[in-house]
Amino acid sequence: MEKSKFRFKIPQYIRWIGWVLLVQFLLINISAAFYAYKLTHVYDDPKLRTAQSSKNIFEKTWRLFTGPRQPRSVITERPTFPYDTVNLKTRKGIDIEAWYSKTDSASRGTVILFHGITANKGMLLNEAYEFRYLGYNVMLVDFRAHGNSGGQTTTIGIRESEEVKMAYDYAIEKGEKNIFLWGSSMGAVVVAKAIDDYELKPSGVMLEMPFGSLQSHLQARARALGFQGFPEKPFGFFVTWWMGIEKGFNGFKHQTSLYAKKVNCPVLMQWGALDNYVLKSETDKIYNGIASTNKKLVVYDRAGHESLLLNDPVKWRIEAERFLSANSK
């Protein structure tokens, strides 16, 4: 008599659970791929800037699943001080526009300013006015896919370090030896990355509200989109992963604290205690990772993710003037 073979039969409900989890995993990845594309592309359609939220439940669900389209930031304000428009070009032929202005008094150096994601150089004019008042030439730069620069794609700070290098080289070619780099949000991250990538030697850097990593930045974007709490973590992970696949880089290595290890020049780092985009843990990790011993962290108790100058003008001016005076050559 032949022995009957024992067969383990998976219960029907477990198979259904398995299929449900598989479908959910596929849908999460499809949605993450859409978001990865949308968050790295800008569109010139002016209707996007005034678009109203659809009341159609199907349209709202589809938009939530695929992510919103981002309009290109438009420059609405120009300097009232004399300036030259500078046109630079990346290695891949992307046009980069900047404004360069000499101070009215004897120059004490040059401050190059870099904006955050979805912003542009026109939004940095308040800071530029302050630096000029302190006796510094200023250069304001539009990153690729922002303002008047070319390109439709941003890498959220990974490849934008080339723009910092080009602006720094431009100031060197003008004969400047006392160069400070100032950046806000993504601009601060890119400044740190450029020092790491190109071994730049500025007289000092001013970093305002840099995010900790691409993944933490995407978690913040998730919070802004309504995915608060637990969902923001898988959102950050999967969108980071898909950005890397779509753009050809390892997004998980995009960490400001790693770049900070190569920052040996004087550093003034500033952050708002009410910032919901950049958390205190990110700020502390970056600051503690900065290689320079000549560094200072200034916290604005009533500020969120915004212009720290406009939030507390007196405090900002005191800190900026002290830092520049102490570190100018």
Model-derived regions, located:
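Alpha/beta-hydrolase active-site loop
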Residues: 123, 154-174
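Hydrolase active-site cap/lid region
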Residues: 193-250, 259
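Conserved alpha/beta-hydrolase
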Residues: 131-150
